[in-house]
């Protein structure tokens, strides 16, 4: 060993070559085996923190998926479309057509995965000359009709990674905003950074109509948040090997990328597509004549829904989606607007119904919350008038319950046992009242 070699030391901890077992040389720097072990511990801790910060619905299935990953899925283990729809029915009211479309798509997605994981003998039995290609889905419907809720409910029951992304933050590569590869990064995080597991997943892209081309005619200026995003999504939707930066590409430009094959990743896109019915009217010539009165609002919505069922790919192109993008999403489903009857059901029937949520909140303070049937109807009518779908329901109930939830924790729990919501409270925007249940009033004999 030369005199120079005897003075080599780790660039991180400063220990000499004689004090460590191994000294690894780099371009102008050295690192010892002890520092390498320390780096591995730090990385393992960061990965654990990342998994712990994920939502419980996304984090819980990870260990179970890892246990079942090595074994191919059999047809008996794949959830049937009826089972998937039944689960959706417990959480989402109405939208039967969209539920059927999603149930069939998820079922076929599982079957593709079962074939890709099967052994060579099994594949031969299934006729490996036929390759099953995926059919991406487009959900079209007004705001607050349940597009995102359908996707979130699917994520709770599926045995594959499921990620939800927002298209409004995406921009073309090189511009301020998120790259399209960040969509795959979310899926990778849900899969606990397991590439093989992420390649089996499903991605829901919300607000996809916001990346529509700003003008039907090409402009001399670049549309970096519209057509540019659609162009960047093309190969990802069809199936390609994408380079995904594990820490995001903008703030850490020199990191090593992870390669993910999107061939078996199912993409579900959703958007409101405001004004699309007008484009269909111009093409079909079924335009309604005359003025719409307030009493005819429901009939107008029905005509709009019927018009959207005549949707063709050329209408989406007219709206601003490029032909290459629409061609990669062959399955299109229209989600109906919510009427008063459906809004009443949404308030009371689902497993996580809004009324049940507030009843549970007040029950924790030993107060029984009761909504009279005509109050439920009044809340649904007001939500229908606001034209924001089911999102208006929570806003209205919050207005009514605000003062009660503010005063209740400070009141004596022995005196307050009931909270009643009436129709007049909803119509007059008055706050709910806390009542003493008759059974809680002490009689002279008991006193």
Swiss-Prot record:
Species of the source: Acaryochloris marina (strain MBIC 11017)
GO cellular component: a single term: HslUV protease complex
Entry protein name: ATP-dependent Clp protease ATP-binding subunit ClpX
Keyword Chaperone appears in the UniProt entry: yes
Family named by the database record: Belongs to the ClpX chaperone family.
NCBIfam families hit by this protein: clpX, PRK05342.1
Gene label: clpX
Subunit details: Component of the ClpX-ClpP complex. Forms a hexameric ring that, in the presence of ATP, binds to fourteen ClpP subunits assembled into a disk-like structure with a central cavity, resembling the structure of eukaryotic proteasomes.
KW Metal-binding (keyword) present: yes
Any single biological process term in GO: cell division
Residues annotated for ATP binding in this entry: 142-149
CDD domains (alphabetical): RecA-like_ClpX (cd19497)
Record-listed Zn(2+) binding positions: 10, 13, 32, 35
